[in-house]
Amino acid sequence: MMEWIDENSSLFVPPVCNKLMYGEGQLKIMFVGGPNTRKDYHLEEGEELFFQVKGDMCLKVLEKGKPKDIIIKEGEMFLLPSRFNHSPQRFENTVGLVIERERLPEEIDGLRYFCEDGVTVLWEKFFHCTDLTQIAPVIKEFFESEEHKTGKPSKESSCSINVDTETELMEPFPLKQWLKDNKDSYRSGSMAIFEKGEFKVHAHGSGEQEGHSQGEMWFWQLEGKATVNVDEITRELNKNDVLMITAGSDFRVKREEGSVGLSITVDSLANK
């Protein structure tokens, strides 16, 4: 993974600032750099998982209807629930991992701008998102709008997404420290980091894991070595190697003593 980040480092600066590692299936695995400070807020019906690989970032949100800044430091992980207004602010010489899921056919995304009070919607547009390149034309549309010129909304919000105004967000946490604190619980097995919502994130220790993937499954080998067999094809994973197992695959993973790995899957209907 780190080698891939180095190879694509030219894309983590303006004007691009991001690169998709995996994106053909359910899981959208991308890396994002900066500087990229923005005024727009994104609203989607799925969760987003953040991990800061290099440097810190600020995620602006509306929590219980009030503006809030969440600082995600290098090495920290954070899960943003479904249907939360959020605006990622990224700084120079930083790289972050962001995982989203494929949108269901009936789902829409929203791009919103707020007035100076931070809570009144100035302008918004909703659309079915199949590609993140759709966002740039929407931003352009806002800057050409009367609302941008006057700073005053011209109509009431028409948001059809049931925006979350009740959840108190978790604090970002250092992944390495979590793994250290919970080592006895997954040393020879596995333990859930997240499992109640859409994203199912598990830490795995030494031993074997096998099954049939109903959906996509992304592996990230954090420490030590692992051998992964997918539909009779074998691959060796070393530290920071990653692998996507496609939906409908039979797999078997064997991790050596002292090995630590993460697996990530998604249930798109979990928060419906």
Curated annotation (Swiss-Prot):
Question: Needs which cofactor?
Answer: Fe(2+)
Q: Which GO terms describe its biological process?
A: 'de novo' NAD biosynthetic process from L-tryptophan; anthranilate metabolic process; L-tryptophan catabolic process; quinolinate biosynthetic process; quinolinate metabolic process
- One Pfam match, given by its short name, reads 3-HAO
Q: Which reaction does it catalyse?
A: 3-hydroxyanthranilate + O2 = (2Z,4Z)-2-amino-3-carboxymuconate 6-semialdehyde
Where along the chain is O2 bound? R38
Q: Where do the annotations place substrate binding?
A: E48, R90, E100
Q: In which pathway does it act?
A: Cofactor biosynthesis; NAD(+) biosynthesis; quinolinate from L-kynurenine: step 3/3
Q: What is its EC number?
A: 1.13.11.6
Cysteine-cysteine disulfides: none
| Region span, Domain B | 170-272
Q: What ranges does the record give for the region Domain A (catalytic), renumbered to this chain?
A: 1-154
Region (Linker) residue spans = 155-169
Keyword Cytoplasm assigned to the entry: answer is yes
An MF annotation (GO) of this entry: 3-hydroxyanthranilate 3,4-dioxygenase activity
Q: Which residues bind Fe cation?
A: H42, E48, H86
| Keyword field contains Oxidoreductase | yes
Compartment list: Cytoplasm
- The broad enzyme category this protein falls into is oxidoreductase
For this chain, the family text in UniProt reads: Belongs to the 3-HAO family.
What is known about what this protein does?
Catalyzes the oxidative ring opening of 3-hydroxyanthranilate to 2-amino-3-carboxymuconate semialdehyde, which spontaneously cyclizes to quinolinate.
Q: What is this protein called?
A: 3-hydroxyanthranilate 3,4-dioxygenase
Source organism per UniProt? Nematostella vectensis (Starlet sea anemone)
